[in-house]
Amino acid sequence: MSSKAARRRAREFALQGIYQWLLSANSMLLIEEHVSQVSGFDKADRELFISLLRGTLNNVDDLQAEFAPFIHRAVHELSPVERAILLLATHELKHNLDTPYRVIINEAIELAKSYGGTDGHRFVNGVLDKLATQLRVTEVSAGRS
């Protein structure tokens, strides 16, 4: 399996864990244990999964504060899937600087298409495009010139 596919799977499993946490408020370690037992997890990049899940869940309030200005409703009113995707992608934009912002946004859009509501991917795209201009100023500017 390619590393790209393994990374995509890691994001999918991290999304599942974040979603689970949003709905259950179970401990991060319990969720990590549960998700790692799901069929197909062996094909995911385990290190990336752990980094994404822990990094996101340890910083939920800060991450939400980053994207909140770009949504037109309270964060808790978002669907759990959209909220989980925004948390995950915001974490990556802030902390995984070796991953290009366009890759992060595209991966988030794909997650929203697979797991979100009908137009959830458009919403996610709009929020993350705006957020990227703040968190990745130099990279976004270079890409637009």
Curated annotation (Swiss-Prot):
Pfam families: NusB
Keyword Transferase: no
Keyword presence, RNA-binding: yes
GO biological process, one term: transcription antitermination
Disulphide-bonded residues: none
GO MF annotation: an example: RNA binding
Spans through the membrane: none
Gene3D superfamilies: NusB-like
Parts forming coiled coils: none
GO cellular component, one term: cytosol
Record keywords: RNA-binding, Transcription, Transcription antitermination, Transcription regulation
NCBIfam families, per the entry: nusB
Family: Belongs to the NusB family.
Function per UniProt: Involved in transcription antitermination. Required for transcription of ribosomal RNA (rRNA) genes. Binds specifically to the boxA antiterminator sequence of the ribosomal RNA (rrn) operons.
Protein name, as recorded: Transcription antitermination protein NusB
